Amino acid sequence: MRLSRLMFASIAAALFAAGAAQGAEPVKIRMSWVAPVTNWASIILEKKDLARHLGKSYTIEPVRFAGTPPMVTAIANGELEISNLAYSTLAIAIENAGMDDLRIIADEFRDGVEGYYSQEYMVLADGPIKKVDDLKGKVVMTNAAGSAVDVAMRAMLRKFGLEDKRDYTIVESAFPTMRAMLSEKKVDMIPAVIPFSYDPELRRIGRTLFVQRDAIGVTDMIVWTARKPFLDKNRAAMVDFMEDTLRITRWYLDPSNHKEAMEIAGRVTKQPPERFDWLFTKRDAYHDPNMLPDLVALQKNVDMTRDLGFVKSAPDVKKHADLSIVEEAAKRLK
């Protein structure tokens, strides 16, 4: 009789646990992004038909920022679950903001990989700036101090003996405003990130002074990060999320889906789809199909951020990487 009661209690407990799991609220994942199409969070929900776990174990809320530096504050305040940080703001978040529990969980894209696109820095085609030295005494633009494009720009100008404040002035503005600022001669150089760098009007009035590869070589430009307590608490949901994300990103990277990807890009940006013929080709930045970062390149990029004075010391990126979630998710797709 006692054995029967124990069996009944065990079965009841198991059923209760299963019911509780089924009735649990999906984990809310707020994801950051800056540039439309270029950042996965801006287009991931356009293929939610491939997200088998969406609405079950997790939900997604994309959140737009002007640059990666403001994301540091947001993730520190618990306003983001996943932040797509640049190599520079990764270092700032860990060293300056004290987020030692920040973990690199996946890769977004890399700049300067051989045969692929590299970020451009543009000046007026008919303007006085012919070489980097000509920027002495001029005004250059960035999206945010400490962003990836900002740090790379400073690194290039330093190669030519030019230092911020002493030799040139930096002003900040959002990427969509930069073409007008250049054409109106309010600034002398802008960082032209994709998709803005392929704007036909910008191509008409501007020319490329240098590319990021010239300044700093291969860059693990953007990585996905999350805080360890969130990952520990929600690991199962995060594996589901990364499984869906890999399925979606691989769909975008498949050349057979290129036409539909262009149509999605046109719809998201309210631009003609034919403007996005470069998307997910070698005219685009490099995207790893497994979303695994290049930690060697990333360490060099973080070290450079230290050398430019944004952080006092460079964190060891391997100690701040947890790739087990994306690796587990990838195994499900084999």
What are these regions (language model features)?
Residues M1-A9:
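Bacterial N-terminal signal peptides that target proteins for export
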Residues F8-A18:
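Bacterial N-terminal signal peptides
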Residues G19-G23:
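Sec/Tat signal peptide C-region and signal peptidase I cleavage site
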Residues A24-E163, T169-S173, D188-I194, V218:
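Short, glycine-/small- and polar/acidic-enriched structural segments
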Residues K47, G55, A76, L80, ...:
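Sec-exported extracytoplasmic/periplasmic mature domains
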Residues S88, P176-R267:
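Pocket-lining segment of extracytoplasmic ligand-binding domains
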Residues D232-K312:
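Secondary-structure end/capping motifs
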Residues V302-K334:
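Conserved C-terminal helix/tail region of periplasmic/extracytoplasmic solute-binding proteins
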